[in-house]
Amino acid sequence: MILITDSAQEHFAKLLSKQEDGTQIRVFVINPGTPTAECGVSYCPPDAVEATDTELKFDKLSAFVDELSAPYLQDAEIDFVTDNLGSQLTLKAPNAKMRKVSDDAPLIERVEYLLQAQINPQLASHGGKVSLMEITDEGYAILQFGGGCNGCSMVDVTLKEGIEKEMLAAFPELKGVRDLTEHQRGEHSFY
């Protein structure tokens, strides 16, 4: 469910050594399955463990996950990264905003999941996003760009070289992608 790297375990072990005996960590998602989902880590003293919690045992600690957050923390990774600028704890949870769909789910659900879990987080760094409008009977995914992607001069490259390649690799049953957006260049446009 959750991978906690060795460096993150060391970091947590140091922090936990200064807490009440038996205190572990809790990993959770606030507003799971929504666009405003946020992940967090907190201390979990022994008296805060609920009967419905899942305990994940690691070499140096245990992480507790509440029943509601668990499906949204599938494939999550916690790491402690040190570089020239300092140290930072990172928590990546690709399923926090949308629950992972099964491989045999309808094509439209699998495409929507790929957009929300992999493509939109990349576009978000430019203030952009893409939405699935439909999948045609001919097998084309019809997309609409928003935010910084709307009116961006690089949108064709993003569509053909990025999104389409990724989607065709993941879904061979698709024939391609089409952009439905009426692009309006403005201050909101990234390029």
Curated annotation (Swiss-Prot):
A Gene Ontology biological process term: iron-sulfur cluster assembly
Signal peptide: none
Keyword 4Fe-4S attributed: yes
Pfam family, one: NifU
Keywords: 4Fe-4S, Iron, Iron-sulfur, Metal-binding
Keyword Calcium: no
InterPro entries noted in UniProt: Fe/S_biogenesis_protein_NfuA, FeS_biogenesis, FSCA_dom_sf, HesB-like_dom_sf, NIF_FeS_clus_asmbl_NifU_C
Gene3D superfamilies per record: Fe-S cluster assembly (FSCA), HesB-like domain
Residue numbers binding [4Fe-4S] cluster: 149, 152
Gene Ontology terms for molecular function: 4 iron, 4 sulfur cluster binding; iron ion binding
Coiled-coil ranges (or none): none
Cofactor descriptive note: Binds 1 [4Fe-4S] cluster per subunit. The cluster is presumably bound at the interface of two monomers.
Cofactors (names): [4Fe-4S] cluster
Function: Involved in iron-sulfur cluster biogenesis. Binds a 4Fe-4S cluster, can transfer this cluster to apoproteins, and thereby intervenes in the maturation of Fe/S proteins. Could also act as a scaffold/chaperone for damaged Fe/S proteins.
Record text on subunit structure and interactions: Homodimer.
Family assignment from sequence similarity: Belongs to the NfuA family.
Protein name per the record: Fe/S biogenesis protein NfuA
Lineage: Bacteria, Pseudomonadati, Pseudomonadota, Gammaproteobacteria, Enterobacterales
